[in-house]
Amino acid sequence: MPIKSRIRTVPDYPKKGIMFRDITTLIKDPVGFRLVIDNMTQHYLSNGIDFDVIVGIEARGFIIGGALSYTLGKGFVPVRKPGKLPADVVQLEYDLEYGSDKIEMHTDSLVKGQRVLLVDDLLATGGTALAAAALVEKLGGVVASMGFIVNLPDVGGEKKIRDKGYNIFSLTEFEGD
C-alpha cells in the first residue's frame, strides 16, 4: 500500500473548506512510518545532496527529522515555537495567511557554513519552511535541501520555495488542495 493511501483526509479542518492531510495515520502504522523514513533516507543517500545536520520544524518535523538523523548519522536541531528553548535564541516572525507567527532556534545550533537538510511533514503555503530557512541562514547555515512527506502544489508553497532557489523533495502530493 503506497504512502499516500495511508494519509487520512479530514474535511473542513481546522476550518470550513480545508482538506486537512493527517499524517498520524501514516506514522502510527509501523510499515507506513518505515516507508517514509526508508524512502527519504534512500533519496538523500542516492542523490548526492551533501548536508551536515538535520533541522526539524515543530512539531511533526521532529518525528521525521529524528528518525532521519538516526538513519543518516547526522545531528538534529529543532526549530521551536517561542518560549520552548532554554538557552539563548534567535527568533523570526513571519506572516501567515491570517496573521503572523514566530519560530526560534538556539543561537549555538549551527556553525557558520554548516549545510542543513530542513524537514517537515507537509508543504502548503511555504511560509513556515521559508521562515525556518531564513532562521538557518541568520545563524550562518546553508539550506542544502528541504524534505517533506506531503506537498500540496496547488497551494503555492513549492513554487515560492523553488523561486527562492531551494531544492525540495516530497514523497507524495495531493493536488487541488
From Swiss-Prot:
> What Gene3D superfamilies does UniProt report for this protein, alphabetically?
3.40.50.2020
Assigned EC number:
2.4.2.7
What InterPro entries does its record include?
Ade_phspho_trans (IPR005764), PRibTrfase_dom (IPR000836), PRTase-like (IPR029057), UPRTase/APRTase (IPR050054)
**Could you state a single Gene Ontology molecular function term?**
adenine binding
Q: In what pathway does it function?
A: Purine metabolism; AMP biosynthesis via salvage pathway; AMP from adenine: step 1/1
- Where in the cell does this protein reside? Cytoplasm
The reactions it catalyses are: AMP + diphosphate = 5-phospho-alpha-D-ribose 1-diphosphate + adenine
Q: Which UniProt keywords apply?
A: Cytoplasm, Glycosyltransferase, Purine salvage, Transferase
Annotated Gene Ontology cellular components are: cytoplasm
Q: Which GO terms describe its biological process?
A: adenine salvage; AMP salvage; purine ribonucleoside salvage
Under the heading HAMAP family, the entry gives:
Aden_phosphoribosyltr
What is the purpose of this protein?
Answer: Catalyzes a salvage reaction resulting in the formation of AMP, that is energically less costly than de novo synthesis.
**Subunit-structure text:** Homodimer.
Hey, which family's this protein in? Belongs to the purine/pyrimidine phosphoribosyltransferase family.
This protein's name: Adenine phosphoribosyltransferase
* Annotated organism of origin: Chlorobaculum parvum (strain DSM 263 / NCIMB 8327)
